[in-house]
A protein has these predicted regions:
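Charged alpha-helical initiation segments
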Residues: 1-39, 141-148
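Generic structural signal for well-ordered, non-transmembrane alpha-helical segments
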Residues: 15-18, 22, 44-45, 118-121, ...
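Long, charged low-complexity segments
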Residues: 1-10, 55-153
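Hydrophobic alpha-helical packing segments in soluble, helical-rich domains
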Residues: 39-57
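Hydrophobic packing residues in well-ordered alpha-helices of helical domains and bundles
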Residues: 17, 39-40, 93, 113
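A structural signal for well-ordered alpha-helices, especially hydrophobic packing surfaces
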Residues: 21, 28, 50, 124-131
Length: 153
């Protein structure tokens, strides 16, 4: 992630978001209910980590919670979070995710799981896009030349 995150632990947390999404996709395509149940946990963790990284970058304290809806409520009012709130309406609560993680209460359907994956991508995309970034180019040079068809003989 290219976000400007000076705290090493927060940067490490943010850098693991893609790994959670990758693992969820692999689990969604793996056979067996165990993998399917764990995929929801990874999707939840991807959302939670990107939200917490954003809040940390903004200097906003947050409670140690797995509740994504509470984290959205903690997000600054300088942005419109209605899209996140809407898509999270299609995502299971943290209690439900925990039950699935521990193989309790059955397994979500494949249709539900892919919908959860879409929700996680949307949430991660919105939060990541709102993070500030800083790019540093050391020892960088550019040489601009006229194209050959514009050079005079």
């Amino acid at each position: 992630m290219t976000a400007d995150l000076p705290v090493v632990a927060v940067r490490a947390m943010a850098n693991s978001v893609l790994r959670h999404l990758d693992k969820a996709a692999a689990d969604l395509s793996a056979p067996g209910p165990e993998a399917l149940s764990l995929s929801v946990w990874d999707l939840h963790m991807a959302c939670e980590k990107v939200m917490k990284a954003y809040l940390n970058q903004q200097g906003i304290p947050y409670e140690q919670t797995h509740n994504l809806r509470d984290l959205v409520a903690t997000s600054p009012k300088t942005h419109d979070w209605s899209a996140v709130k809407t898509v999270l309406g299609h995502f299971p609560s943290e209690q439900r995710v925990m039950k699935w993680r521990y193989q309790e209460g059955g397994v979500p359907s494949l249709n539900d799981l892919w919908r959860f994956y879409d929700v996680a991508l949307e949430v991660c995309s919105i939060y990541a896009a709102r993070m500030s970034r800083r790019f540093l180019l050391d020892n960088f040079s550019v040489q601009i030349r006229r194209p050959p068809w514009l050079e005079s003989d």
